[in-house]
Amino acid sequence: MDSTPHRKSDHIRIVLEEDVVGKGISTGFERLMLEHCALPAVDLDAVDLGLTLWGKSLTYPWLISSMTGGTPEAKQINLFLAEVAQALGIAMGLGSQRAAIENPDLAFTYQVRSVAPDILLFANLGLVQLNYGYGLEQAQRAVDMIEADALILHLNPLQEAVQPDGDRLWSGLWSKLEALVEALEVPVIVKEVGNGISGPVAKRLQECGVGAIDVAGAGGTSWSEVEAHRQTDRQAKEVAHNFADWGLPTAWSLQQVVQNTEQILVFASGGIRSGIDGAKAIALGATLVGSAAPVLAEAKINAQRVYDHYQARLRELQIAAFCCDAANLTQLAQVPLWDRQSGQRLTKP
């Protein structure tokens, strides 16, 4: 049987050492361009991209997306990430806390409030675990464990399907999700892990009462590729590799979710490589922009390397807003987007 901590260590190693970006698929952001303003009416340093979300003030609309936990190595990574989130005024999600639910002695690998008392912090469990004995008690434990402001429930059907000993029982989850959302005292964020969320699924998630949807689209890390590198069976490895281009590109998924929902927060992650991608995502309707894998190697070294990485992305975001004559997030969300290939302006909801 594949232990959860061992799997977490494998994931870190593979993401760092192997090429696990989706093959033959991109985020779709490269097809989009923001309308440039040659004469901005705002000073660069006056651009203010701050917001308040669930009672927490953020300096920038950026999220350090969920990465890891459950091992001593993960503890240090999470501390570095949290220190940077605190210093820059951005949000952070922890990796799946299933390992610590199974073994409370591992809770320390997720606990970061000592270095990040003020950040918007998200707990994390797999939604499919609601079919394996998890419920309100385990969800509340995950939240309490890290003093979280909200709970991520991640969706990873493809990863589970190609993973050794993956969870195969997915029927009946809608009603369990709705019951948990109603009972839990903090907001629930439902996110994919790199294959995107469609418009119809987003609409049903809104009907369930979730607080936010993180599209986590295709074009970044492919978890079928990660699992292919873990497989020892030749046929299983081939099957996993063949799903490397599976999923909804992040930009496309984001458009679909925004168009099919109303008055729900939408986060954009999945292959976000620059602040320019982030600005495009906000112009498409995202409230927060998340990134993870590009900084993992830096997080293995020290907090300063992580800080430098995210500071650069945030500077890019600020410059992009400035060059669109957007003084704040509200104005950035209204900036026109154009399709490079067709030359057509995108229609926004």
From Swiss-Prot:
Listed under catalytic activity are: isopentenyl diphosphate = dimethylallyl diphosphate
Keywords per UniProt: Cytoplasm, Flavoprotein, FMN, Isomerase, Isoprene biosynthesis, Magnesium, Metal-binding, NADP
Q: What is the name listed in the Swiss-Prot or TrEMBL entry for this protein?
A: Isopentenyl-diphosphate delta-isomerase
Question: Might you give the EC number(s) for this enzyme?
Answer: 5.3.3.2
UniProt GO molecular function: FMN binding; isopentenyl-diphosphate delta-isomerase activity; magnesium ion binding; NADPH binding; oxidoreductase activity
Q: Does the keyword Isomerase apply?
A: yes
Q: Name one GO biological process term.
A: isoprenoid biosynthetic process
Q: Which Pfam families match?
A: FMN_dh
Subcellular localization: Cytoplasm
Q: Which residues take part in binding FMN?
A: 65-68, 96, 124, 191, 221, 271-273, 292-293
Q: A cellular component term (GO) from this record?
A: cytoplasm
Q: Which residues bind substrate?
A: 7-8, 96-98, 159
Q: Which family does it belong to?
A: Belongs to the IPP isomerase type 2 family.
The species is Synechocystis sp. (strain ATCC 27184 / PCC 6803 / Kazusa)
The record describes its quaternary structure and partners as: Homooctamer. Dimer of tetramers.
- Per its UniProt entry, what is the enzyme's top EC class, as one word? isomerase
CDD domains (UniProt xref) = IDI-2_FMN
- Keyword Magnesium listed? The answer is yes
**Which residues participate in Mg(2+) binding?**
160
* Protein role: Involved in the biosynthesis of isoprenoids. Catalyzes the 1,3-allylic rearrangement of the homoallylic substrate isopentenyl (IPP) to its allylic isomer, dimethylallyl diphosphate (DMAPP).
Q: Which cofactor does it need?
A: FMN; NADPH; Mg(2+)
